[in-house]
Amino acid sequence: MAEISAKMVQELREKTGAGMMDCKKALTEAGGDLAKAEEVLRKKGLSAAAKKTGRAATEGAVASYIHMGGKIGVLVEVNCETDFVARTEGFQGLVKEIAMQVAAASPRWVRREEVPADVVAKELEIAKAQAREQKKPEAILEKIATGKVEKFYSEFCLMEQAWVKDDKKKIQDVLTDAVAKIGENIQIRRFARFVLGEGLEKKQENLAEEVAKAAGLQK
């Protein structure tokens, strides 16, 4: 078992706001892994972030982000508890980071609970069909399919996506860190992502004809 140092306990305490003994117990349970210990505290509701999640967050900000010369645009709404925090540089920076994440990672939902049941059922069905094609035993099809759906969530649910600036963190971790630092409940409510020309059928032209037109060789 890894030795739990006072420095590790202090680091976890500063990050989560939990008590010293709770931090030490969490680190012991997590085998000295700080990230896992933080998760242990969150699950037990002992971290500062966990204690704040039940509080009403009705203030906040709507931010926009335009990427690639106007080809991708994002609107995102992030809520906090007070207008004072909503106007701080730290909160505004967080909202901007979330908007950039949406632009870069193309999530479809904020959290897994928003994914329609029929979409989940279809993903399970596809995963099982693929496993059967690979001659996997029927007894483990459900386990394989569940694993595939978990991967689906991590790809398309914003809160479970790897952060584009540090893939060791999920967006949920980024939010948890912000809650602990800012001191208020913070929630990502919704987002919209726009891609120029998405869903439109582009006219396909012959490359040779295009070159000829550009050179003035065709009328």
Swiss-Prot record:
Residues 82-85 are annotated as: Involved in Mg(2+) ion dislocation from EF-Tu. This is Elongation factor Ts. NCBIfam families: tsf (TIGR00116). Keywords: Cytoplasm, Elongation factor, Protein biosynthesis. It comes from Anaeromyxobacter dehalogenans (strain 2CP-1 / ATCC BAA-258). The gene is tsf. Pfam families: EF_TS (PF00889). SUPFAM superfamilies: Elongation factor Ts (EF-Ts), dimerisation domain, UBA-like. CDD domains: UBA_EF-Ts. Belongs to the EF-Ts family. GO terms for molecular function: translation elongation factor activity. Associates with the EF-Tu.GDP complex and induces the exchange of GDP to GTP. It remains bound to the aminoacyl-tRNA.EF-Tu.GTP complex up to the GTP hydrolysis stage on the ribosome. GO terms for cellular component: cytoplasm. It is found in: Cytoplasm. It comes from the Bacteria. Signal peptide: none annotated.
